[in-house]
Amino acid sequence: MNINVADLLNGNYILLLFVVLSLGLCLGKLRLGPVQLGNSIGVLVVSLLLGQQHFSINTEALSLGFMLFIFCVGVEAGPNFFSIFFRDGKNYFMLALVMVGSAMLLALGLGKLFGWGIGLTAGMLAGSMTSTPVLVGAGDTLRNTASLGGQLGVEQDHLSLGYALTYLVGLVSLIFGARYLPKLQHQDLPTSAQQIARERGLDVDSQRKVYLPVIRAYRVGPELVDWAAGKNLRELGIYRQTGCYIERIRRNGILANPDGDAVLQIGDEIALVGYPDAHSRLNSNFRDGKEVFDRNLLDMRIVTEEIVVKNHNAVGKRLSQLKLTDHGCFLNRIVRSQIEMPLDDNVVLNKGDVLQVSGDARRVKSIAERIGFISIHSQVTDLLAFCAFFVIGVMVGLITIQFSNFTFGIGNAAGLLFAGIMLGFLRANHPTFGYIPQGALNMVKEFGLMVFMAGVGLSAGSTINSSLGEVGIQMLASGLIVSLVPVVICFLFGAYVLKMNRALLFGAMMGARTCAPAMEIISDTARSNIPALGYAGTYAIANVLLTLAGSLIVVIWPELPG
């Protein structure tokens, strides 16, 4: 039996889509030196190559893909988005605005200078900023721009072409910029990180390997009683001195949970909970020949839970003010906007932060009720909320606003982004509403993006050869300019206008570019994860601004001369 692969793929959109995705994801795993191509560019390259062979796909798949992606971007940004405006995020918002605004203005100027259409210009902006939200926002607005008429298909093809040509330029140039730009300024990042650590009482080396706490039991002897000198547990402050706390005491055969007024006596058997290294550092008064193995004494359920910060008595407070250890709980990590924060007592908590806390199940539940709620451990998505807010986003996107003779449609991108932000925000404030496991959210977002990339690549592939020779060199040079010049402008603005600490500034700049690989380089250069504070500050707002920039550049293009 002979199988014509070309006919098979042309006759089956679903098969063609997943062939493109499979080949593109394989290509995306390749590395060029320290730079990995990535899934989006891999799928785009494969789809462009197959598009040259006149393979095509149903455009509805393209629309559904971008809608899922942009909605999930909003859901991720929602928990921390509003805190950018209402707390101390003014500097971060301004940095993100300067980064995105300067890049958009440069792209508009270069597009007019070289006589490109809006498709190439918007695609170049998206690729140079390595930002799929720009691409998605521009693509959606193009489809809703009636004035393009017969040029719509050409501009959509040029959009993906501009993105494909400049994506690697944007990624590689930003990575090199992150590596070498800190060396060109007067303050080195390690010194800046240490400075902000001293000012805020942070630990510059607050990255550590996390272990779960363990429970071990010891018999109290004369040495330990002498060391305690008659003080009760509250006065002794055993946790401050040892890193462990006393969870249980067996005295005269009776097992009890001690309060702060308990005084140690000879013959007591005490259960200590702490990290393994804390047990190893215990004074010899505790452990030399005195460890006991008692099933009942050691029978305690240590759990690890993710607690979402929600309550007003925790939001805006320093971590030390929660007094987790006084309640017998251990903090393993802090996550904000999917970014791990410095693990330090002086980190200020935002609504939506996730604290990973270990300890006795009762104690962890008690502390969770004080500061927020325990994140649901279910793997079941609240599909009702997901679908309902998706519908709301589409309906909002249908709204049009008219100024004189100019009509502006909000569009699906902005509408779905708004609906996603609201769903994410409500989820951060109501533990049983709108739950979406992070793995499920990542999968839907990534799949939607890959479907969108496959669609635009197959659509644009047939015209790539004729367009590449006309704009290739100009496009690459413009991509380099749009990638690096806004970074320099943002640095000057942050350093000399906002007078920000350099470690926080460089982290915030990488957040404004939503580029995790460049952020890793900044952290390595600073020998600290303190720049993550700046990255988390700009990341959520930058995703929103980049989507709006993609739509805005298409809207204002016809109004510009030239």
Swiss-Prot record:
Subcellular location field: Cell membrane
What is the predominant subcellular site recorded for this chain?
A: membrane
Named from the GO MF annotations, one term is: monoatomic cation transmembrane transporter activity
Annotated TM spans: 8-28, 32-52, 66-86, 93-113, 116-136, 158-178, 383-403, 406-426, 447-467, 478-498, 537-557
Answer whether the UniProt record assigns the keyword Magnesium to this protein: no
Q: Which domain of life does the protein's organism represent? A: Bacteria
* Keyword Transport in record: yes
Q: Which Gene3D superfamilies match?
A: Regulator of K+ conductance, C-terminal domain (3.30.70.1450)
Where does the record place the RCK C-terminal domain?
A: 202-288, 290-373
Q: What is this protein called?
A: Putative transport protein ECA2683
Keywords assigned by UniProt? Answer: Cell membrane, Membrane, Repeat, Transmembrane, Transmembrane helix, Transport
Look up the record and give one Gene Ontology term from the biological process aspect: potassium ion transport
Kindly give the SUPFAM superfamilies that the UniProt entry links to this protein: TrkA C-terminal domain-like
Protein family according to the UniProt entry: Belongs to the AAE transporter (TC 2.A.81) family. YbjL subfamily.
GO cellular component terms, semicolon-separated: plasma membrane
Topology in membrane: Multi-pass membrane protein
